[in-house]
Amino acid sequence: MDVTVSKVDTKLLDLLVCPLTKGSLSYDREKNELVSEKARLAYPIRDGIPIMLISEARRIED
């Protein structure tokens, strides 16, 4: 499934924050994830819905 960020999704991205750090997120189009650089976590997007649960996040390795 190819998911692209639309105008509405961009507004949503501006509102969403990392649930752990409350910091901003960036969108990784290649992996279809929202990334928190501060927490070193990547939150998956499934069927166009960001899964903002720490337990579902992937830890980003160096």
UniProtKB/Swiss-Prot annotation:
GO cellular component: cytosol
Family under the similarity heading: Belongs to the UPF0434 family.
Alphabetical list of Pfam families matching this protein: Trm112p (PF03966)
Source species of the chain: Rhizobium rhizogenes (strain K84 / ATCC BAA-868)
Superkingdom field: Bacteria
Name by which UniProt lists this protein: UPF0434 protein Arad_4458
Phylogenetic classification of the source organism: Bacteria, Pseudomonadati, Pseudomonadota, Alphaproteobacteria, Hyphomicrobiales
InterPro entries: Trm112-like
